[in-house]
Each structure stands twice: as C-alpha cells, then as structure tokens.
Amino acid sequence: MNVLEIQNVSKEYGNKKALNSVSIEVKEGRIFGLLGPNGAGKTTLIRIINQITAPDKGEILFSGEKFKRKHIQNIGYLPEERGLYKSMKVGEQCLYLAQLKGLPKNEAKQKIHHWFKKLNMMGWLNKKVEELSKGMAQKVQFVSTVIHQPKLIILDEPFTGFDPINSEIIKNEIIALKENGSTIILSTHRMESVEELCDDIALVNSGECILNGTVEEIKQNFKEHIFEVKYKGQLKGNIQHFETLSSSEGYAVFKAQDKEYTHTLIKQLVEQVDVISFNEKLPTINDVFIQSISNE
C-alpha cells in the first residue's frame, strides 16, 4: 500500500518551474530517499506535502484518500531550517508541539519522558533552547517530530549538527521507527546514509523526477559489469573480452567489454587460478547521483 502518491504535481514561482509534472509513490513501512542537488525542487515538494504551499497542478493521495488538512496530523516533519523557540524551556517546547499534533497533555508528558530517557536527554528538560548546542537542539527537534507516532515522517537533513556517535544513535532510531511501522521520507546529501537506510529513492533535478525505484533496481540499472576477484595462483595472460582495471598479487578487477561476456569470466579464471571470491561491483548511490546529474 502507498502511504503517499504524488501524481503529476507542478509548481511555478513567477517564470520559474520549481516542479514539472512530478510523480512518485511512497510505500508503507519503507524509507524513501528524496535526492537531488541544491535548487532541484526537493524543498518545494516537501512543502507541498506538508501543505505549507499548494501545487498549481496535480494531485496528492494520502493512504488512498485525496489529501486534506486532516492528514497533517499523521505527518511528522523535521525541516532543514530549525524552528525551535529559543527562549522556551525544552520540556515546555516539546509539550507544546506534541499537543499541537493532537496528543492529550498527560500522554504527551509520558511520551516526552520516554524519549528523553531513551536518548539520555533528561537533564535538558528545564534548559532553555538557547542554552543547547546545535546537536542537542537537533535531538530535541527530532523527538518533537516523532513523538505523536505519525504515519509518515519527513526528515530533511536530519544528521546536521551531529557528531558520529549521535548520528549513529539517530540512524538506529530511524531504523526502529521503520520496524515499528512508520513510513519515512529522508532528504539528505549524505549518500552513505541513503545507502544504509533507504529502500527506495527518487532523484529530482531542475524540477523533474529523473530517477525513481528501489535502491537495488537502480544499482542494477547503472552497473558497468565490473567484477572483483580474489584468487590463488598466477594469471598467465589477458582474460578474453575483459579489461583489467587493477591488479595485484591475488587480486584483480575486471570490466566486461560487453554484458554478453559476463558469464565467461569465472570460466576463464578457474582454468588458470583457484578463485577464492568473486563479486560483481555495483555502483554506489553517490556514483548514480553524479552520473545522473552529469548526464542531464
């Protein structure tokens, strides 16, 4: 089932097309990576999903229903631009935001206690936001985003301000949220996070969706038939129909001249050496990103 369906959505600001007939589907219980260079249209799309602005054309469905104001209660949004009130105490801030999302006061207090204890934040409750470091404030905003257990969570650059330890903590919390049934849209320039977390991705450039699918499908579509081999013995000569990209004792990387020859590599190798391991090298999402944008 799709939690979110964006169908041919367009948005213009004056003469500039921020989005041009964009269509994507976000499946329930998965992490969806929304990728693109600066100015590609990602922020405009996120604002439309949050009903901060409206599309000029197109339609949005939420769990199969036409997207309405009531659905905002089922969305948690962590914006790239931080929005905490600096003079408020942290606990009061979280309580206020939780109640805005429809949680009764007592339930909100219980959930704040749960999350603050879980993330080792109990000592922050009576601090003012302005007393917090950037990373501490980011943790508070993350809790405020997920506290009402929204069906759809939108995280725009969620790792900004975090050291490696806290980045890992938040990454694990994102995985736990998915395992507990939440659907997550992750917008980030950290391609290693996309590799680790995302099931599906869409790549937006110049207001258009130029790539859309599962991470595995996209990697398969962009693969260049490159193989890494570890072996024992001595390679006696060139491998027919393959270019040797790199080679050292007991290790080599080969690229097929054409995909029709890929099945012949292992056969040629075992005639010369004892093969220890044989792996096809798939492109990283960073490779896919750079190639796709460069080709536009």
Regions found by a protein language model. Give the residues of each.
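Conserved ABC ATPase "signature" region
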Residues: 95, 99, 107-124
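Conserved ABC ATPase signature
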Residues: 128-135
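Catalytic Walker B motif of ABC-type/P-loop ATPase nucleotide-binding domains
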Residues: 153-157, 162
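Short, charged/small-residue-rich alpha-helical element at the C-terminal edge
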Residues: 224-296
